């Protein structure tokens, strides 16, 4: 978890350089309740979704994903409004807003298992 947190912090620093107004929102931190996923060939989260889909997840600000292996065919994380597919590569970090602007889905790997870690930057009470 420490390596994941360190990688997220480095990526977040770059993200804030690109979007400096992020420093103007309420205080936030990495939720340590991360999710390790192993997606088998033909599986995936096929439904379009966003990470903040109502009051039950209203504390989520950013989605943070790190791919733990390369996937040669399929397995992309696809973003609807951005018309973007991100191929899993070991160590690749993806950070995006948790909001409705970034609906996404996990396309199924064709062969081989896709491994990744998901975490969320969340608003915290002062």
Residue ranges and their predicted role:
Residues 1-93, 101-126:
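Fe(II)/2-oxoglutarate oxygenase catalytic core
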């Amino acid at each position: 978890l420490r390596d994941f947190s360190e990688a997220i912090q480095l990526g977040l620093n770059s993200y804030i350089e690109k979007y400096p107004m992020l420093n103007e929102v309420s205080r936030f931190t990495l939720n340590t309740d991360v999710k390790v996923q192993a997606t088998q060939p033909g599986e995936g989260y096929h439904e379009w979704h966003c990470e903040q889909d109502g009051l039950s997840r209203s504390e989520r600000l950013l989605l943070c994903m790190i791919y733990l292996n390369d996937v040669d065919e399929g397995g992309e994380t696809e973003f609807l409004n951005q018309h973007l597919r991100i191929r899993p590569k070991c160590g690749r970090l993806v950070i995006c807003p948790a909001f409705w602007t970034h609906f996404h889905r996990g396309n199924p790997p064709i062969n081989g298992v896709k491994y990744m870690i998901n975490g969320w930057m969340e608003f915290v009470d002062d």
